[in-house]
């Protein structure tokens, strides 16, 4: 079943007397319908979150070459020889198991953020995970996630009324049995769907199992949070588009033995869905085992052990994922970011392990990343009761991603993260997101809408190469006309029209530029 057929069946569009958001679906009929269905399949930026469950030991992940004496004194029984470190610069190096990611770093596609944490850190796995996923302070208990709140603003009312012509695909996908707090919206509704494991994906693609029932309504979400979070097996409405995307692309990069490296198995699937044109905005994958209280290294072999194996998995999986994206030509659309609920203490314990700590490094990978060491490494001697002090708040990283990758307005970011946070440059200049690249038809070109998403006034830029009347219109997600921005003869060359969105509700709108029989359409997201 192709995407158009799937949407027609699932919403009753055009031919069946169904309603969408209380409006008759014949509003979708006519030439605009074709435009909405034929919007660029690869129009949105993608964020891939890699969760390292258990609390990753950052001190043995990014090695402090320039603090070697303090490092050896604090953890002599698990200290990795600095001669084995994979140098990032003269001061820092990666664990020797991370050769693949080190090569990607050398290709200027990896940013390293050291000392990422938050004030008054909590060393409980469950509580600290909630803090990272909710984007809250340690003294706040929040029942929604930072990504969920962002997506909730971009796709208001989800899941009611979805899929739509503008967003026919899952908004977010988590490779897990349930959707995590990070993807939970303000009404405690899941903003995505869960694929329990890689086997579930391949069963779905091969048709050996169904996607389950439809998504529950928002009313059900409010009355039964667990039900809406546990959407695995209930997202049949999206199974067809996932199968269609998977059929469009095969993995090109070598991911190694994915039966052993489960992170590689998950990222392999994400690459296939992105390359296949799925418009999903956020993916969440994970790897467990980082709670290394004991046997983190082998006795007398500090470069080997459970932590080395895990870091090797992360390194190989992320590097293969980046190569796969590049082989498919979609690398500019994807940003990959690691996180863990906390780091480990500076001092090792007597069991060849480390105990719960505070700050730890994050890796951000992508072709648009400002590569290199982005934040300073904490001191191994100036400690907070034996723990590393933080160099940067994790919410500064979130704010930077929201602003520089997704193009979110600072006022929107303040609402998402509950306060203002200073950002750190992580995305190359000129790479700020827009929903659609320039599209052309005949002598007509519609450029990227800026900013996008937009809170106030957007600028619509277009180029005219033929001496015919031009019309620029805005429609809402149901196909109803909202505004005409320009109409009449235009001189040859580029033109622009401002569009004040301050009176519009949040949601996805469509700008349609027409000239004779030629027309081009781009999506624009309004946030409040």
What do the PLM-derived regions correspond to, one by one?
Residues 1-315, 320-328, 347, 364-367, ...:
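Feature for exported/extracytoplasmic and membrane-associated proteins, marking the mature portion
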Residues 65-68, 354-356, 435, 491:
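Glycine-rich, phosphate-binding/catalytic loops in enzymes
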Residues 429-441:
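Low-complexity, Pro/Thr/Ser/Gly/Ala-rich linker/spacer regions in secreted
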Residues 440-450, 454-528:
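C-terminal outer-membrane/trafficking sorting elements
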